């Protein structure tokens, strides 16, 4: 249920940002706001504390963000405080990023490897994925030594697991079945 609400909030904010031609600005501001909220224990505790009034929480946010972010974005934060959803701002940001990718005909491909891919490998992988999905691909690389070797690629719900670890796990299962 909450994912649906997160999506609705994110879509509403995205449409405002799109109307104002400030989508990138809103996304960047939301990322920074999340860093401030989740990176500052004192602020986080104020927001989280049930005995601190909504009025005081809103005042705190106005003091921090007024004049630094767009008024519509600040209003959005005020609504989240009123609805007691401000602690779930990260989820709204994630949904807004998904909407942004969808609207730009782009998919996020998460790639795990033991060593960073070379520019040539990235280019070839992106080309292959763009051909397969007929969409632009945004590649996010992660180094994961536990996979031993090969690549692990996730695009949406699709997984391409060409890791040495998965092959070894498969061989182990086959050998255990034979016993």
Curated annotation (Swiss-Prot):
Entry GO terms, CC: plasma membrane; proton-transporting ATP synthase complex
Pfam families listed in its UniProt record: OSCP (PF00213)
Molecular function in Gene Ontology: proton-transporting ATP synthase activity, rotational mechanism
Alphabetized SUPFAM superfamilies for the sequence: N-terminal domain of the delta subunit of the F1F0-ATP synthase
Gene3D superfamilies: N-terminal domain of the delta subunit of the F1F0-ATP synthase (1.10.520.20)
Membrane topology: Peripheral membrane protein
Keyword tags: ATP synthesis, Cell membrane, CF(1), Hydrogen ion transport, Ion transport, Membrane, Transport
Keyword Transport found: yes
Tagged with keyword Ion transport: yes
Compartment(s): Cell membrane
Family: Belongs to the ATPase delta chain family.
Assembly and oligomerization: F-type ATPases have 2 components, F(1) - the catalytic core - and F(0) - the membrane proton channel. F(1) has five subunits: alpha(3), beta(3), gamma(1), delta(1), epsilon(1). F(0) has three main subunits: a(1), b(2) and c(10-14). The alpha and beta chains form an alternating ring which encloses part of the gamma chain. F(1) is attached to F(0) by a central stalk formed by the gamma and epsilon chains, while a peripheral stalk is formed by the delta and b chains.
Primary role: F(1)F(0) ATP synthase produces ATP from ADP in the presence of a proton or sodium gradient. F-type ATPases consist of two structural domains, F(1) containing the extramembraneous catalytic core and F(0) containing the membrane proton channel, linked together by a central stalk and a peripheral stalk. During catalysis, ATP synthesis in the catalytic domain of F(1) is coupled via a rotary mechanism of the central stalk subunits to proton translocation.
HAMAP family: ATP_synth_delta_bact
Protein name: ATP synthase subunit delta
Source organism (scientific name): Clostridium perfringens (strain SM101 / Type A)
Lineage, opening ranks: Bacteria, Bacillati, Bacillota, Clostridia, Eubacteriales
Name of the gene: atpH
């Amino acid at each position: 249920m909450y994912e649906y609400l997160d999506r609705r909030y994110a879509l509403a904010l995205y449409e405002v940002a799109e109307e104002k031609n400030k989508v990138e600005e809103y996304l960047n501001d939301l990322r920074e706001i999340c860093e401030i909220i989740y990176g500052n224990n004192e602020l986080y505790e104020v927001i989280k504390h049930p005995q601190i009034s909504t009025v005081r929480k809103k005042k705190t946010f106005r003091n921090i963000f007024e004049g630094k972010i767009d008024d519509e974005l600040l209003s959005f934060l005020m609504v989240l405080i009123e609805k007691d959803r401000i602690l779930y701002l990260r989820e709204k940001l994630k949904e807004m990023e998904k909407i942004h990718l969808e609207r730009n005909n782009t998919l996020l491909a998460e790639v795990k490897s033991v060593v960073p891919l070379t520019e040539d490998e990235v280019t070839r992988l992106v080309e292959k994925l763009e051909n397969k999905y007929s969409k632009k691909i945004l590649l996010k690389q992660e180094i994961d030594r536990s996979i031993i070797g090969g690549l692990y690629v996730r695009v949406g719900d699709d997984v391409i697991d060409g890791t040495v670890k998965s092959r070894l796990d498969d061989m182990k299962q086959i050998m255990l079945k034979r016993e």
